[in-house]
From Swiss-Prot:
SUPFAM superfamilies for the chain: ARM repeat
GO molecular function: cadherin binding
Residues where N6-acetyllysine is found: K117
Stretches assigned to the W2 domain: 248-415
Alphabetized PROSITE patterns for the sequence: W2
Keyword Cytoplasm in annotation: yes
GO CC field: cytoplasm; membrane
Subcellular location as annotated: Cytoplasm
Name used for this protein in its record: eIF5-mimic protein 1
Organism: Homo sapiens (Human)
Positions of post-translational Phosphoserine modification: S412, S414
GO biological process annotation, one example: regulation of translational initiation
Assembly, per entry: Interacts with EIF3E. Interacts with EIF2S2. Interacts with EIF3C.
Amino acid sequence: MNKHQKPVLTGQRFKTRKRDEKEKFEPTVFRDTLVQGLNEAGDDLEAVAKFLDSTGSRLDYRRYADTLFDILVAGSMLAPGGTRIDDGDKTKMTNHCVFSANEDHETIRNYAQVFNKLIRRYKYLEKAFEDEMKKLLLFLKAFSETEQTKLAMLSGILLGNGTLPATILTSLFTDSLVKEGIAASFAVKLFKAWMAEKDANSVTSSLRKANLDKRLLELFPVNRQSVDHFAKYFTDAGLKELSDFLRVQQSLGTRKELQKELQERLSQECPIKEVVLYVKEEMKRNDLPETAVIGLLWTCIMNAVEWNKKEELVAEQALKHLKQYAPLLAVFSSQGQSELILLQKVQEYCYDNIHFMKAFQKIVVLFYKADVLSEEAILKWYKEAHVAKGKSVFLDQMKKFVEWLQNAEEESESEGEEN
């Protein structure tokens, strides 16, 4: 069967699609066009932003995103490792970039705005920019100290305004950066810039969302991964808020472990003397205050039993159970603040577990008689230290007992005066 040649349409010109037009550009052509435009715009960052906005319609930002961001940050295309590919040819580089900018927060913030505008205009660059920043952090050893500082400031500002996620910081945990002290030094500069944009709560919240709150010690070599070393390093750098945050995080981790072990010992019905000894040792070893422990003890004690579902029976069951563990609670409620925390925990528990609503007053009286709670703590709770949960119900329950305490106090005072 003969194959016939397909007819060719003559006299017709086809317009190249814009997408295909873009793909004709090679990285070097892309680089030259970008460098020329940045040099023409000069130090006028508004002009730079406009140039980048308009040029995106004819340059393929999607394909050459790494080249685009290399040049905007370092002024040149970067080879693997961070060295400049065109270091010897000034015509292929620009001085109008982050690394050539003045080393002050306001100047770098203005550069950050250029990145913000570019990524808002071309949303598809968002992921590419995140990848670029992770890459640049891996290349820190190739950059000078002042370049590292400017990159840290830029990263902190962009983290502050939400352009970058905190996950970029994982690059800092690279062994070589950690061992040479670059990771910790860079992190301090970055956090300072971040906290100049946002408050400490916002910064720590972002760290938690990125699951980095428990990894901050990894900024230091293994032999220096202690809370004390971190706290001193960051406090000396003016970042006490981060030091305090890490201490709290470490304390929370310790408390979880302590709670788990306590729960196990209570379920095995270990003698109270043994539990007291264990808790005291853990408090000393982990520098835990009594105020941090009393709430844990209450939670563990209440979790150690299967409660009756009938409201009329649960109060009796609770009193019997708590009477057994009152000596344990008494040991760790020797301070007024600890007593108030315990009272608030009892209040919250009785509110959250509806069968216990009517048992609150009976529990407090039991603790008073067992020397777990003092008269002063109960009166302070009643007057000002109660929490909002079910307060009207519980204050009403406690009214007669509080009146009795106040009368007893007045009688005691009058007897003292007579004597």
